[in-house]
A protein has these predicted regions:
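Radical SAM enzyme core and accessory elements
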Residues: 1-37, 41, 327-335, 341-472
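Short glycine-enriched, charge-decorated loop/helix-capping segments at active-site entrances
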Residues: 211-217, 288-292, 358
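Core AdoMet radical
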Residues: 107-124, 128-231, 237-240, 244-246, ...
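Generic structural signal for well-ordered alpha-helices
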Residues: 88, 126, 154-161, 185, ...
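Conserved C-terminal portion of the radical SAM core fold
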Residues: 141, 195, 200, 221-285, ...
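An N-cap/entry alpha-helix motif that binds or orients negatively charged groups
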Residues: 36, 40, 47-84
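Canonical Radical SAM [4Fe-4S] cluster-binding loop centered on the CxxxCxxC motif
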Residues: 80-121
């Protein structure tokens, strides 16, 4: 039986509730009056239930679909403006004991090059990332209790935070590692992580078990209940996601929103972020083996409806997607993107040769960070390297209350401009710098609070003179 605030995976992700939701959406996909009513409700910026959102996703009326896209753009702008937070993944190790059939890290893969970074290698990778201009990392590692124990992850986090190269620093380390215990989540909390990220992959229990036949990850309930353990351990910010294409997208879309509702019902705060990766080619993995892979049009609609249903959450897209696809979804809901990414173990300090391939998946957007920043500036977005909320304790329910009230813009807008200015001064190519300076000048005029605007202008001037690390 469906129960949003249950601690049991099969109750807060209830299979029958998802089937009933999909039937409801299918039966009403041409019900203009009902769909218009839901669009009007969503325009109040309070979100939608999983059942209501499933109907918008299923809507087959072209003019109403266009209204859905316009509303998603409006909601994105209201809560996140034209700011796009930049980050990069750092893969520590691809040793893994699981048997996930869609991931080249799986235990039986004998063709992939296995690697694990030493602390000295991590130091070199972080310096390379800092020299690119990155301030925020997403730490990744395969699940291997012997080679990648929690102690290795904790030591790696400490190493990353300790490195200050030239004007560089990594003030926020988000962590994407396998489901673990409350005790280990407390250790991650004490290590000062930002967001704990864990993709569900698919919410369909039977399909999940067939995709994860062996290893610790094969335990559906333990994996699905991981965010509860993380939040019980005191981690304020958690990030959800599914790998679209492993199962029917309608099912996983609904399960994803039910998971968000569960966190809100149980802990009073929903997911800090939602990621929307799609299955893509990798070493010994072909997308042809996954018949549920989705088209660009469906992908864009998924992004738009998630933004409408969960207006407060950050939305992440990686370099799995091409530049063209990333451009489409920026206005529809995405608020964080990676740039200059490597999905190999390391690879920033010294790029891998083809023979050394250790990557988890193939990258579609191969541009450098500066090329991505330049592109965002051309599109009128503000590339943001801000980590202020985490450092000021604006996490969990405190962050969400600011987002839901719209007050977060008083912090985020000037912080984005100041961190962009730092990037322009320290790392940008001349053309990128010129474009960025013009955008900052334009965006300063949109800061409504005169006092904040005055302080921002003063700080920007001091950044030009060599000072760093200003924040509201």
């Amino acid at each position: 039986m469906y129960k949003a605030d249950s601690k049991i995976a099969e109750e807060f992700i209830d299979h029958q509730e998802i089937l009933d939701t999909l039937e409801y959406a299918h039966n009403n996909k041409s019900n203009r009056a009902l769909i218009e009513q839901l669009i009007d409700k969503a325009a109040q910026f309070k979100g939608l239930s999983h059942r209501e959102a499933a109907l918008l996703l299923e809507c087959d009326q072209p003019d109403l679909t266009e209204r859905i896209f316009r509303l998603a753009q409006e909601i994105k702008h209201k809560f996140y403006g034209n700011r796009i937070v930049m980050f990069a993944p750092l893969y520590l190790s691809n040793y893994c004991v699981n048997g996930c059939v869609y991931c080249p890290y799986h235990l039986k893969n004998k063709t992939i090059a296995r690697k694990k970074l030493t602390q000295e290698e991590i130091r070199k990778e972080v310096i390379a990332l800092q020299d690119m201009g990155h301030k925020r990392l997403a730490l990744e590692a395969g699940e291997d209790p012997l080679r990648n124990p929690i102690e290795y992850i904790l030591e790696s986090i400490q190493t990353i935070y300790s490195i200050k190269h030239k004007n560089g620093a990594i003030p926020r380390v988000n962590v994407n590692i396998a489901a673990t215990t409350v005790e280990n989540y407390r250790k991650l909390k004490d290590a000062g992580i930002g967001t704990y990220i864990l993709f569900q992959e698919t919410y369909h229990k039977e399909n999940y078990e067939s995709l994860h036949p062996t290893g610790p990850k094969s335990k559906y309930a333990y994996h699905t209940e991981a965010m509860d353990r993380a939040m019980e351990a005191g981690i304020d910010d958690v990030g959800l996601g599914v790998l679209f294409g492993l199962n029917t997208y309608r099912y996983d879309f609904t399960g994803l929103l039910m998971h968000a509702e569960h966190l809100e019902a149980t802990f009073g705060v929903g997911p800090h972020t939602i990621s929307v990766p799609r299955i893509c080619p990798a070493d010994d993995i072909s997308t042809q083996d996954f018949p549920d892979a989705i088209s660009d049009d469906i992908f864009c609609k998924i992004v738009a409806v998630i933004r409408i249903a969960v207006p407060y959450t950050g939305m992440i897209i990686s370099t799995r997607e091409s530049a063209a696809t990333r451009r489409k979804v920026l206005n529809l809901g995405i608020s964080q993107i990676s740039g200059g990414s490597r999905t190999s173990v390391g690879g920033y300090a010294i790029p891998e040769t083809p023979e050394e391939n250790s990557a988890q998946f193939d990258i579609s957007d191969t541009r450098t960070l500066d090329e991505v920043v330049n592109w965002l500036l051309d599109l009128g977005h503000i590339p943001s390297f801000c980590t202020a909320c985490y450092r000021a304790g604006r996490t969990g329910d405190r962050f969400m209350s600011l987002v839901k009230s719209g007050q977060i813009a008083n912090c985020c807008a000037p912080n984005a401009l100041m961190t962009l200015k730092e990037y322009l001064e320290d790392y940008a190519a001349p053309d990128t710098r010129a474009k960025g300076i013009q955008l900052i000048k334009k965006e300063l005029e949109h800061i409504p609070n005169p006092k904040i605007k005055e302080i921002a202008i003063r700080n920007l001037k001091e950044i030009e003179e060599g000072k760093r690390d200003f924040r509201f």
